[in-house]
């Protein structure tokens, strides 16, 4: 009988809300694969005093749960914290985007340096896209490419009118979905609005539905099925989960070349990669919106389905657990 692997996720931020929802959903997928997962939410990443308190809380969790593997779901301070607070436990780090390609501010550069140092401490490195892996200063060759993944049973196509009925939307309007998240400046909401205004000069009955961090995650599948198109204009991305969710629902996507969007949209009908220019975006939006045709993006869901990603992570965890078991006679630390 194979005993389940015990994995402790380290996730930045509070447990509530939509922040890092993809990490929590990944834990659910792993549980379905037989992995025993516990979640530790790192509440503060800036205050040394709070980090010291969090370290004590984290060590108590490690002692009580006794994980075979620790998985940090972000770089920067989150990954360094996991490496420092439990140095004898095998560590997996998933780099997700702004931890390796953040803003060129003092804080952004510091975060990138912390991420690069943390990469030296990891037993396994996961990057959500090839483009992000290229940002590593070292250990690129050993880093695994695994997007966050989406649940194909949660995100699946259904008639647009049914989704609109649940949301209370008009059946006649054209709706462009835009994910502003917690950082509208990086997502380039300004560019999206400029492109939409130009498109409104070409089409009538058009509006934008902007998603922010306050949108309940359970509502997102309905939004994907109710909208006519997803627009993505970000300056920086890792592997935007919103693109994967849209593809799983056959929602047409118009996106700039950022993160792994070119790879994700390659061969998908009724979707396009566009220059980061409002006029070019407007022309493509108008083309897609004139005919209410869905994409065939669901044909690609096998590349990023949650069960496939969970299976790959299970393999990594079991390798690390086996290595730790072999070394256990030499390690008496509870951390």
Predicted regions span which residues?
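Aromatic "clamp/platform" in nucleotide-sugar-dependent glycosyltransferases that forms part
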Residues: 235
């Amino acid at each position: 009988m194979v005993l389940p692997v015990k994995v402790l996720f380290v996730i930045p931020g509070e447990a509530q809300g939509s922040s890092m929802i993809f990490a929590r959903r990944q834990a659910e997928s792993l549980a379905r694969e037989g992995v025993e997962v516990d979640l530790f939410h790192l509440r503060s990443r800036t205050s040394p005093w709070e980090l010291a308190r969090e370290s004590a809380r984290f060590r108590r969790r490690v002692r009580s749960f006794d994980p075979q593997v620790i998985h940090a779901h972000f770089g920067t301070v989150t990954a360094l914290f996991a490496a420092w607070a439990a140095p004898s436990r095998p560590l997996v780090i998933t780099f997700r985007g702004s931890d390796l390609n953040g803003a060129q501010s003092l804080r952004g550069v510091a975060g990138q340096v912390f991420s690069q140092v943390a990469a030296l401490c990891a037993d396994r490195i996961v990057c959500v896209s090839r483009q992000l892996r290229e940002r590593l200063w070292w250990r690129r060759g050993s880093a695994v490419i695994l997007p966050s993944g989406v649940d194909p049973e949660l995100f699946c196509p259904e008639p647009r009118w049914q989704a609109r009925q649940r949301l209370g939307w008009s059946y006649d309007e054209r709706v462009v979905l835009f994910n502003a998240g917690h950082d509208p400046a990086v997502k380039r909401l300004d560019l999206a609005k400029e492109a939409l205004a130009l498109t409104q000069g070409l089409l009538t009955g058009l509006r934008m539905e902007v998603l922010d961090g306050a949108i309940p995650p359970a509502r997102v599948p309905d939004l994907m099925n109710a909208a006519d198109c997803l627009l993505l204009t970000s300056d920086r991305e890792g592997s935007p989960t919103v693109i994967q969710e849209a593809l799983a629902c056959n929602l047409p996507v118009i996106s700039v070349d950022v993160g792994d969007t070119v790879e994700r949209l390659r061969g998908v009908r009724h979707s396009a990669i566009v220059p980061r220019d409002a006029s070019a975006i407007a022309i493509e939006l108008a083309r897609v919106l004139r005919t209410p045709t869905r994409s065939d993006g669901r044909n690609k869901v096998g590349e990023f389905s949650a069960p496939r990603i969970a299976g790959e992570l299970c393999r990594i965890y079991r390798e690390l657990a086996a290595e730790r078991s072999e070394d256990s006679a030499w390690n008496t630390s509870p951390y």
